[in-house]
Amino acid sequence: MDAVILCAGKGTRLMPLTENIPKPMLPVGGAPILERIINKIDKLVENIYLIVKYEKEIIINHFKNNDKIKFIEQTDIDGTGYAVLMAKNHISGDFLVINGDIIFDDDLTNIVNDDVKNIITLNEVDNPSNFGVIVVDNQNNIIELQEKPKNPKSNLINAGIYKFENKIFDILETLRPSERGEVELTDAIKELIKENNIKGIKLNGYWNDIGKPWDLLDANTHILKNIKTDIKGKIGKNVVIEGAVIIEEGTEIKPNTVIEGPAIIKSGAIVGPLAHIRPNTVLMENTGVGNSSEIKGSIIMKNSKVPHLSYIGDSIIGENCNMGCNTITANLRFDNKPVMVNIKEEKVKSVRKFGAIIGHNVKTGIQVSFMPGVKIGSNSWIGANCLINNDIEKDSFVYKKEEIIIKTKRK
């Protein structure tokens, strides 16, 4: 059996993090989402076909040394259905299709070993209206698919993992683009439903469709629950390490630093002195957290620095950022209500504690503060003493004008 993983989309709801990086390559628990999916299925399949398009070079360069992986560029037409169709000339039998932006616990052996040819995996949720809803009969035959319905007939949703027989390619070739101009995989599934030829199987354990920034933090927290302590690198005097913590080779933890697990500190990171790393934090490769800085429940991506006297809480900082002294991310409203975040020009409720989403190559001056839920576009500079309470577009230069009055003292 082979597998097709859909990795071509832009991931606009995760902007600014996806302004330079494809969504499947965003880190969760210290590794890209796509790498976690591939590790799940590596022993179940013979070949893995990655359907790529947006920022494809990043994906190709990361996985180019894996002989099992082949890359197919999605051309001409957008849509998940057309993405699957791109693999037609490479696959002869049954195969898996997996969305490239999901985190899940299930090992998928039940799906692979099941005699049923066409399967959609299902997950039970409290908010089915946000997803594609699946209705099944008492034998798990799928009898209806509803796309983000206002009045869902079920709390079972499409979990984005499928098994198909080769016949699906014939159906996909007959489909016309939707109103969005895309060939949709769901339209092919509806044809299988008409034929009474597709079943649903519930996934076991955790599942998360990484569609919004706080989903990254939720999945990150879940993965960190299962880590085991593995401490390498250079550990300075009076360093306190509590709970499950992974510190990779090539790191340096300077004196009097406190690290509370679960947490992961990747190779090349320099932490301290007097830094405080709190639970559910991941510091990616070559990051820096300096004197008296505190990081809590956050992801700091590659090559980014939080040098001194700063607080980063429930936030995500992109690659190659530098936070000036006393940079603060606020993460809680006075009324304890969910933090509101702009997603594609719409205000969306996130979670109770949620900080800032900072894109790539961002610099802040001294004493910059971010209000809960703000997003900072990539390649932006935020000048000293700014309080940021609105989203900032990429390539912006934000600064504050203040009049400084200088007088001669009276004698």
Swiss-Prot record:
Example GO molecular function: glucosamine-1-phosphate N-acetyltransferase activity
Protein source organism: Methanococcus aeolicus (strain ATCC BAA-1280 / DSM 17508 / OCM 812 / Nankai-3)
Function: Catalyzes the last two sequential reactions in the de novo biosynthetic pathway for UDP-N-acetyl-glucosamine (UDP-GlcNAc). Responsible for the acetylation of GlcN-1-P to GlcNAc-1-P, and for the uridyl transfer from UTP to GlcNAc-1-P, to produce UDP-GlcNAc and pyrophosphate.
Region of interest called Pyrophosphorylase, as start-end residue ranges on this chain: 1-204
This protein's pathway: Nucleotide-sugar biosynthesis; UDP-N-acetyl-alpha-D-glucosamine biosynthesis; N-acetyl-alpha-D-glucosamine 1-phosphate from alpha-D-glucosamine 6-phosphate (route II): step 2/2; Nucleotide-sugar biosynthesis; UDP-N-acetyl-alpha-D-glucosamine biosynthesis; UDP-N-acetyl-alpha-D-glucosamine from N-acetyl-alpha-D-glucosamine 1-phosphate: step 1/1
Reactions this protein catalyses: N-acetyl-alpha-D-glucosamine 1-phosphate + UTP + H(+) = UDP-N-acetyl-alpha-D-glucosamine + diphosphate; alpha-D-glucosamine 1-phosphate + acetyl-CoA = N-acetyl-alpha-D-glucosamine 1-phosphate + CoA + H(+)
Keywords (A to Z) from UniProt: Acyltransferase, Multifunctional enzyme, Nucleotidyltransferase, Repeat, Transferase
Record flagged with keyword Flavoprotein: no
Top class in the EC scheme: transferase
UniProt region (N-acetyltransferase), positions on chain: 225-411
E.C. designation(s): 2.7.7.23, 2.3.1.157
Binding site for N-acetyl-alpha-D-glucosamine 1-phosphate: 80, 132, 144, 158
Keyword set includes Disulfide bond: no
One GO biological process term: UDP-N-acetylglucosamine biosynthetic process
PANTHER family: N-ACETYLMURAMATE ALPHA-1-PHOSPHATE URIDYLYLTRANSFERASE (PTHR43584:SF8), NUCLEOTIDYL TRANSFERASE (PTHR43584)
Residues reported in the UniProt entry to bind acetyl-CoA: 384, 401
Alphabetized CDD domains for the sequence: LbH_G1P_TT_C_like (cd05636), NTP_transferase (cd04181)
Descriptive protein name: Bifunctional protein GlmU
Cited Pfam families: Hexapep (PF00132), NTP_transferase (PF00483)
InterPro entries reported in the protein's UniProt record: Bifunctiontional_GlmU_arc-type, GlmU-like, Hexapep, NTP_transferase_dom, Nucleotide-diphossugar_trans, Trimer_LpxA-like_sf
